[in-house]
Amino acid sequence: MPRYRLLVEYDGTPFNGWQRQDKGLSVQGILEKAVEKLCGVPCTLHAAGRTDAGVHATGQVAHVDLPRDYPADTVRDALNYHMKPKPVAVVAAELVDEDFHARFSAVGRAYLYRIVNRRAPLALDQHRAWWVPVALDAEAMAEGARRLLGHHDFSTFRASECQAKSPMKTLDVLDVTRVGEEIRIVAEARSFLHHQVRNMVGTLKLVGEGKWSPDDMAKVLEARDRTKGGPTAPAAGLVLTGVSYSASGGKSGPTG
């Protein structure tokens, strides 16, 4: 069966996450229904990352095996037609080797977290950013973020329901920059623990508020205890921006 790789973009606001569920709307469920309308038989999609409820994506990657060959552009256009008016789009589709796997072939994932730091509430971006009205020191947050880089036990930033076999991860990038009233946090790693990015952001906010020092980030990391970390940042500010593959597998998204 021919295998297709899909580059998928979605607004996570109305969804209960990527993963198909018995009840509730899911991105996977919407895509699989569209695939079935295209080819007439049920097909299972596999994604690079199973994003949580409310988390968005501009660079999600999925693959699906179809019962016959279709032009890649036909796959893209047909799926987009059948998904209307849901806020999901297949940006690109391509035929790939049968050994490609959206999840297991990935060598890197990139996320962007947006904080809007101003007194006025958000009228347009309330579902696409975390509104923080208290002044934040982005430079202190950036310094604290550097304490987390490298290979560590990230238990402090791991959700209690995380199913990963090990809390050991290598964090390659955790950059914090301010652009006007917006603070952008970019995180890149081969893979992340459940809620890892949002838990790191929630903890960095404490540094930005001056409640913690940048050195406190190293201390809570060493504690390996979720109760020692900061709160989980809201899902709305998080975007999966890209997934990286080996040279033969290519990459997705602007930061993939």
Swiss-Prot record:
Keyword set includes tRNA processing: yes
Pfam families: PseudoU_synth_1
Organism: Paramagnetospirillum magneticum (strain ATCC 700264 / AMB-1) (Magnetospirillum magneticum)
Reaction catalysed by this enzyme: uridine(38/39/40) in tRNA = pseudouridine(38/39/40) in tRNA
Binding site for substrate: 111
CDD domains in UniProt: PseudoU_synth_EcTruA (cd02570)
EC nos: 5.4.99.12
Gene3D superfamilies: Pseudouridine synthase I, catalytic domain, C-terminal subdomain (3.30.70.660), Pseudouridine synthase I, catalytic domain, N-terminal subdomain (3.30.70.580)
The family this protein is said to belong to: Belongs to the tRNA pseudouridine synthase TruA family.
Phylogenetic lineage: Bacteria, Pseudomonadati, Pseudomonadota, Alphaproteobacteria, Rhodospirillales
Coiled-coil segments: none
Oligomeric form and interacting partners: Homodimer.
MF (Gene Ontology): RNA binding; tRNA pseudouridine(38-40) synthase activity
Purpose: Formation of pseudouridine at positions 38, 39 and 40 in the anticodon stem and loop of transfer RNAs.
Keywords: Isomerase, tRNA processing
GO annotation, biological process: tRNA pseudouridine synthesis
Listed SUPFAM superfamilies: Pseudouridine synthase
Annotated active site: 52 (nucleophile)
InterPro entries from the UniProt entry: PsdUridine_synth_cat_dom_sf, PsdUridine_synth_TruA, PsdUridine_synth_TruA_a/b_dom, PsdUridine_synth_TruA_C, TruA/RsuA/RluB/E/F_N
Record PANTHER family: PSEUDOURIDYLATE SYNTHASE, TRNA PSEUDOURIDINE SYNTHASE-LIKE 1
Protein's name according to its UniProt entry: tRNA pseudouridine synthase A
